[in-house]
Regions:
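GST-like domain detector, emphasizing the conserved glutathione-binding G-site
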Residues: 1-165
Length: 165
């Protein structure tokens, strides 16, 4: 119970550090017909940026965790994109497969945002994501280090649903 409470406090502190990004969503979002697929790892500040925008746009998406040392989904990214770089987004609705958080964010607003334009708050990210990095550190840098306890854990039989942000 204490571990869970600590994670809740970490998540809140991380969200507040980022100026509240990732804590609200768009009403009546433009949902894609097929779920978007995001290959990412939790500790990456660049992946964090994409997750914040997916939350803001209130989009349903599938997350494929690719922590350091993980073998399950990293090979798919390498096969499809040619390199191990994260985040990696696949949108089967448009046939797009892409790297680079800034490009992904612009793409998401263009195709699924209300105006089709990336708001200034999300287009003017600094090159080095200091604030997002602080959020990663507050959250214990999960996904940055190899966790031997979970490295070969089997995937669940069906996708898990997360409600919240």
């Amino acid at each position: 119970m204490v571990n869970h409470q600590l994670k809740v406090v970490q998540a809140l502190a991380s969200a507040l550090t980022a100026g509240g990004r990732g804590v609200s969503g768009t009403a009546f979002p433009k949902q894609p017909e097929k779920s978007l697929k995001l290959y990412e790892f939790e500790g990456s500040p660049f992946c964090r940026r994409v997750r914040e925008v997916l939350t803001l746009l209130n989009l349903d998406y599938e997350v494929y965790p690719c922590p350091k040392g993980g073998a399950k989904y990293r090979k798919i990214v390498k096969e499809k994109g040619g390199k191990l770089r994260f985040p990696f987004l696949i949108d089967e609705n448009t046939g797009i497969e892409m790297y680079e958080s800034k490009d992904i964010i612009d793409y998401l607003f263009k195709h699924y945002g209300k105006s089709g334009k990336t708001p200034k708050k999300y287009s003017d990210y600094p090159k080095y994501p200091v604030v997002a990095l602080v959020g990663t550190l507050i959250n214990g840098a999960r996904g940055v280090w190899i966790n031997q306890k979970i490295i070969n854990r089997e995937a669940p039989e069906q996708l898990l649903e997360l409600w919240g942000f």
